[in-house]
A protein has these predicted regions:
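Short acidic, glycine/serine/threonine-rich loops at helix termini
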Residues: 2-5, 33-35, 63-68, 129-133, ...
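Active-site rim loops that border cofactor/substrate pockets in soluble metabolic enzymes
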Residues: 19-32, 163-167, 171-175, 247-258
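Gly/Ser/Thr-rich loops at beta-strand to alpha-helix junctions
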Residues: 1, 59-61, 171-173, 285-289
């Protein structure tokens, strides 16, 4: 039901598509790789599918790096592999995952009627940069090339050194980890080293998106959140997501506060050793849309000097309503 609900938010329904839209978690063992890794596949596809055509965005992953990351291979291995495929995938070390994706995909391509795949690459503004149909025999090699290109299009914060990052919304519709690990510079995976860049001392998040349907995966990546966000968390969905990946710390609940003001004042209290005029802060709507942001006075001169950024307005203090909610926002303005 949860899978169908998410598809519905994207307009993918039986009425809109003119075909049945089915969610299924039942899988069967399809075979194994040369290393003995078991390969699972969707039972309904095994029994009824004449052809299989995976469709997915090709982009960098939030938990591992390699020749293939998020894309068609992962859709075949983890998506159509169901809980069995996902569980086995996430039980191995991060360094092994790209190799695993390629090996398991080869087994699937050899045993299932995969016609090919449809790869989607987006630019830094979540606009479609390219859609490419790839025949099965070229699927892996072409995905490797598309991933390298997609990384050159990735958005990034205007600076990689911050005292504080304020995020208006987190959610699965922005990143599989709620807040993109590549943007905030945090992995929080036990036994794995953290990223060297960007370096952000504290991350605060105001809200959880409605489109996330209570799945707050990634909330453990941040330091401060609001009661509003915590009240929206579906613990069952969040825990299932993180127990499947085994990255359980990403589901830990951070310090939370009744209002935006209280949360941000706490973050500033933790930064009290930094002179106010030197505090480096950025406010963004989410970790996907980074075209517009608010920056503190300490950052502004270095951005202006690059000539790559346009200043849209004068410096001003952050504004709050009577309930302590932030009204100075990049997204839709709050009126109450």
């Amino acid at each position: 039901e949860g899978q169908l609900e998410i598809l519905h938010t994207y307009g993918i329904t039986q009425e809109a598509m003119g075909i049945p839209v089915i969610a299924n978690n039942d899988v069967e063992l399809l075979g194994s790789t040369s290393r003995g890794i078991q390969v699972y596949f969707d039972k309904l596809c095994l029994e009824q599918a004449d052809l299989v055509i995976p469709i997915n965005r090709v982009k960098t992953h939030t938990s591992f790096k390699g020749c293939v990351e998020s894309g068609l291979c992962k859709k075949l291995v983890v998506g159509l592999g169901g809980p069995g495929g996902a569980g086995q995938f996430h039980s191995l070390g991060q360094a092994e995952l790209p190799r695993l994706l390629v090996e398991v995909t080869k087994v699937i391509l050899g045993k299932m009627p995969v016609l090919g795949g449809v790869a989607i690459v987006e630019n830094a503004y979540e606009e479609t940069a390219r859609i490419k149909a790839i025949p099965a025999e070229a699927l892996i090699e072409e995905e490797i090339r598309l991933l390298a290109w997609s990384k050159s299009l990735m958005p990034a914060l205007p600076t990689d050194r911050l005292h504080g990052l304020i995020v208006e919304e987190m959610g699965k519709n922005f990143s599989g980890t709620g807040v993109d690990t590549n943007i905030i510079g945090r992995l929080r995976i036990t036994g794995e080293p953290e990223m060297e860049s960007p370096r952000i001392r504290y991350v605060s998040v105001l809200d959880l998106s409605e489109a996330s349907h209570g799945n707050a995966t990634g909330v453990g990546l941040v330091d401060f959140v609001t009661r509003r966000l915590v009240d929206k968390i579906d613990r069952k969905a969040t825990y299932l997501n993180n127990l499947t990946t085994t990255f359980v710390t990403r589901a830990f609940t951070p310090l939370w506060f009744d209002t935006d003001r209280e949360m941000l004042e706490t973050m500033m209290f933790c930064l009290r050793s930094v002179p106010l005029a030197e505090t480096r802060l950025i406010l963004i709507p989410n970790t996907l849309y980074l075209a517009d942001c608010y920056v503190s006075e300490a950052i502004l001169p270095e951005l202006v000097d690059t000539g790559r950024f346009e200043v849209l307005g004068p410096l001003r203090e952050l504004a709050f309503d009577a309930q302590g909610n932030l009204t100075s926002r990049i997204g839709l303005p709050r009126t109450s």
